[in-house]
UniProtKB/Swiss-Prot annotation:
GO terms for biological process: chromosome condensation; sperm DNA condensation. Pfam families: Protamine_P1. This is Sperm protamine P1. Protamines substitute for histones in the chromatin of sperm during the haploid phase of spermatogenesis. They compact sperm DNA into a highly condensed, stable and inactive complex. PROSITE patterns: PROTAMINE_P1. It is found in: Nucleus; Chromosome. Belongs to the protamine P1 family. InterPro entries: Protamine_P1. GO terms for molecular function: DNA binding. Testis. The keyword DNA-binding applies. GO terms for cellular component: nucleosome; nucleus.
């Protein structure tokens, strides 16, 4: 739960979330299977795609 806490909270900035919890990106497949983590994974993947 702690992994997705940062992604879900709006108070924390996106860049901060990336620095704090880089595990969400690595374990995208496993975490994305969960309904609560799907938003976090999608959000991060979208930002990563646009960036690169």
């Amino acid at each position: 739960m702690a992994r997705y806490r940062c992604c879900r909270s709006r108070s924390l900035s996106r860049s901060r979330c990336y620095r704090q919890r880089p595990r969400c990106r690595r374990r995208r497949r496993r975490s994305c299977r969960r309904p609560r983590a799907s938003r976090c994974c999608r959000r991060r993947y979208r930002l990563r795609r646009r960036r690169y």
